[in-house]
A protein has these predicted regions:
Chain B
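N-terminal regions of ATP-driven nucleic-acid and macromolecular assemblies
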Residues: 1-175
Length: 655, 175
């Protein structure tokens, strides 16, 4: 049974695809109970009588992460669970209240989406040959009621152009005739509600869903890794996969293969997997695994950290280890990178909420993360020669990155802050151990960030081997012919701003305009052009010889600047708020959007061009006609300074 | 056992007090009262405590617990068996858990029958007001005296007085 989509509506609907590509709906009656534990059931006997009479409550025992509990199974919904909480003055412990029922059904049945061989869930070799259709809409969804220019690619490419109502009606016709299993559509989640309003008004049937039904996800703004993100409301069709190619992080990073892999692991429909963050995916994966193993999932996160002495807390809560680099240019440098360091630590050191008190028990987190870690090792290796594994590898990388942060997340079902701290404590020990080891073997340690170490010296293969032996973790090596560690404003080395030439002839760049999404195109492409020239230099001697050529790129860009197309100067920002107490360019941009009738929400991305920086005057990208030349010249100069440092800094050679 | 916040303002065992005060007043009250070392002290704060890095208490009787959800806060209060329970208010805990304001307030009141319970915030907000409704006393100390040393440093850096007014020019500019 190859499941393409899953929905819970008075039972579970599985949309299954057969070998011929026909998709049909299978309905299963399913009404799982949630579980209730009371410290003193006799104190709530009246409530239990009602639950027994009206909600089929029955005494039972069930397994939590920390062991077996006696309690009751109750057939009811979340609302009932919340009433029980109120009634018991929040003494009740509830489980399996908010697990997605379609996911729970599949976990219990041992099936998963996008695959039909039960043994292949952790395999990177699965079919992605779905009938797909790409819909590229040229219009701006924030400013136009209906699209007027659309390119549709199925078996062939068609362009639809004309009045909105005609284009949308034609698009509906194409979806119906091609009948794709997967639709990849730009800004799908913004367009679909508009299409629905149009279809209701004109009496048309919107053909994205196979049975005319849509699930609704509401819009929200949320904090993720220190920045505000915004998710549009979404209409999700039944029986067909619809991916918003602009908004889906998983699709952007991992492509369709990444979305399908996320769905296979998490047990969520690809429609949901495409719309969730890696953090939600890893948590869904843990929930699927818990249900599969017969462990109930807590409804509320009520178990707080244990009481600690202040000194213990200060010692434990210190995060990752850093070694600050000395800014400069270095030749023959090796970057040793621990593959999936934090998840590997969880697995190797058996770190899980329940093993903190009972270290000899086999931990839930290590058990469920181990197959993902080994799958990541495999895809990381295979993508070097087979690019089709790159999307899956990236998805796994993100899921594993977030699995660590998730242990400390306040609402993590299977997280606990002490586990988070134990992981970082181990990582600090490992990085220090590795540094000491490298230095004892005659290497010079230049820089270190959490799970990476930059060293000069040889033989690096022996060092790698020794690191593996001592730490039990695998360290990958990338060799730089030369690398530039940039300075901070105060002259000390920046942790995360560097670039260099790898021995395969490519450049690795971090933290400068060429890699920053917020930098204007004109500056990003200027720096990329410079780096392409620098990439031809195999050592610092050759690098010095391309200086004039690189400088010419800068001077030419400066000269062209006054005549540049304003759209190439757009600055992208993800806004964290919509009200600003101080005057700033970002605040002016938010106001400019509003003046043009575009509603903004925290987490949304905006693009603006600076018309007059001193007066805080900016224009949205679509309105810009002029720009502040001196302001952009200063941005260009900053970008040049990052590059020019490679020609002026001190060269450090090994030994 | 009591904590002296200001002359004439003391907090005693067997009460639940809601206190609004400048941070330096509270840290001074916690750091400069050696008698507190003799009692079991539980300091409760969220993920972004403004006080904890300024507390110089190292006694083994001084313990910290950090709830990151309102449900965890309720558990922490219910499990506390300390003589002094000090809660640094974190409004973010209640952003999606307003349902717990009343039970948490009641748990603080209940704990205040046996212990000295302090709910502290530097300024009033809606969750604090809801929790403080069940307090025996609401104490607000307004910063009229000497400024917080940290505030003073920030003012010096920004070229303003600690009260926010611009500093007068003290040297002549040389062209």
């Amino acid at each position: 049974m190859w499941v393409l989509d899953t929905v819970y509506r008075d039972g579970v609907d599985l949309w299954c695809r057969d070998a011929s590509g026909t998709v049909t709906r299978k309905h299963y009656a399913y009404d799982p109970p949630f579980y209730l534990h009371l410290a003193d059931p006799s104190a709530h006997h009246e409530m239990l009588d009602v639950l027994e009479a009206e909600f089929k409550a029955e005494p039972c025992s069930f397994f939590t992460l920390f062991g077996e509990l006696d309690g009751f199974s109750v057939h009811g919904n979340r609302q009932l669970a919340e009433q029980i909480e109120q009634q018991t003055r929040f003494d009740a412990r509830l489980f399996n209240v908010d697990v997605r029922r379609d996911q729970q059904f599949m976990a219990e049945q041992g099936i998963f989406p996008c695959g039909d061989d039960p043994g292949s869930r952790f395999s990177a070799d699965f079919s992605c040959s779905l009938r797909r259709m790409e819909i590229c809409i040229r219009d701006d969804p924030a400013r136009t009621p209906l699209c007027t220019e659309v390119e549709v690619t199925g078996d062939c490419t068609e362009t639809l152009h004309g009045p909105g109502h005609t284009v949308v009606a034609d698009l509906f016709g194409l979806v119906e005739s091609i009948d794709p299993e997967v639709i990849l559509m730009s800004h799908a989640d913004t367009w679909l509600p508009k299409f629905r309003a149009f279809s209701v008004e004109k009496g048309l049937t919107m053909p994205f869903s196979r049975n005319g039904k849509y699930r609704q996800m509401s819009s929200r703004s949320y904090w993720s890794y220190g920045r505000m993100e915004h998710k549009e409301a979404a209409l999700i069709p039944d029986g067909r996969v619809l991916i918003d190619t602009d908004e889906s992080f998983v699709y952007r990073e991992g492509g369709l293969a990444g979305v399908l892999m996320a769905s296979r692991l998490s047990g969520l429909s690809p429609n949901m997997a495409a719309r969730f963050t890696p953090g939600t995916l890893i948590s869904s994966y843990e929930v699927y695994e818990a249900v599969k193993r017969g462990i109930v999932v807590p409804f509320r996160k009520a178990d707080a950290e244990t009481a600690r002495k202040l000194a213990d807390l200060r010692a434990a809560d210190r995060g990752g280890m850093m070694f600050q680099p000395k800014p400069g240019i270095y030749e023959n440098v090796n970057e040793l990178d621990f593959t999936s360091m934090y998840p590997s630590i969880i697995v190797r050191y058996n770190l899980s909420p329940e093993t903190l008190e009972n270290p000899s028990a086999k931990g839930f987190l290590p058990a469920v993360l181990a197959p993902v870690v080994s799958l990541r090792r495999e895809t990381k290796e295979r993508k070097r020669t087979e690019p089709r594994y790159a999307g899956i590898d990236t998805l796994l990388k993100w899921m594993l990155v977030t699995c660590f942060g998730y242990t400390g997340y306040k609402n993590a079902k299977f997280g606990r802050i002490e586990v988070h701290e134990a992981i970082t404590a181990r990582s600090r020990d490992i990085l220090i151990q590795t540094k000491d080891l490298a230095e004892s073997m005659g290497f010079v340690v230049l820089h270190g960030i959490v799970d990476c170490l930059w060293v000069q010296g040889s033989p690096v293969e022996v060092l790698q081997q020794r690191i593996g032996d001592v730490t039990g973790l695998r360290a990958e090596n990338e060799h730089f012919d030369w690398i530039v560690f940039l300075p901070l404003n105060d002259g000390f080395g920046a942790y995360n701003r560097y670039y260099g030439r790898l021995s395969d002839g490519s450049m690795k760049v971090r933290g400068i305009a060429a890699r920053r999404h917020d930098a204007p195109d004109i500056i990003r492409s200027m720096q990329q052009e410079m780096l392409e020239v620098m990439c031809t230099a195999k050592d610092t001697g050759e690098l010095a010889r391309v200086r004039d050529k690189v400088r010419k790129i800068y001077l030419a860009a400066l000269q062209r600047l006054p005549l540049a197309d304003p759209r190439t100067l757009a600055i992208s920002r993800r806004i964290s708020r919509t009200r600003y107490t101080h005057r700033c360019l970002e605040g002016a941009a938010v106001q400019a959007y509003r003046d043009d009738g575009v509603e903004v929400a925290p987490g949304m991305k905006i693009r603006y061009i600076v018309r007059d920086a001193r007066r805080y005057q900016v224009d949205p990208e679509w309105r810009a006609k002029t720009f502040d030349v001196p302001y952009y010249r200063s941005l260009m100069e900053k970008a040049w300074n990052d590059i020019a440092y490679a020609f002026g800094g001190r060269v450090m050679r090994p030994g | 056992m009591q904590i002296r916040l200001r002359p004439g303002i003391t907090l005693r065992v067997g009460t639940f007090s809601a206190v609004i005060a400048p941070e330096h007043v509270i840290t001074a009250a916690l750091n400069e009262n050696p008698e507190l070392e003799r009692f079991l002290f539980l300091f409760v704060c969220g993920n972004y405590s403004r006080l904890i890095s300024h507390i110089g208490r190292t006694a083994s009787s001084f313990e910290v617990r950090r709830p990151f959800t309102a449900d965890q806060l309720l558990t922490v209060i219910r499990e506390a068996a300390h003589t002094i329970i000090f809660i640094e208010h974190d409004p973010s805990l209640f952003e999606t858990a307003e349902r717990l304001l009343e039970p948490v307030g009641s748990a603080l009141k209940e704990a205040g029958r046996e212990a000295l319970v302090v709910l502290y915030a530097p300024s009033m907000d809606r969750p604090f007001a809801a929790l403080a409704r069940q307090a025996d006393r609401l104490i607000e100390i307004v910063n009229t005296g000497e400024p917080d040393p940290r505030q003073r440093m920030a003012a010096v850096r920004s070229g303003h007085r600690a009260d926010g007014r611009p500093q007068a020019q003290t040297t002549l500019e040389v062209q």
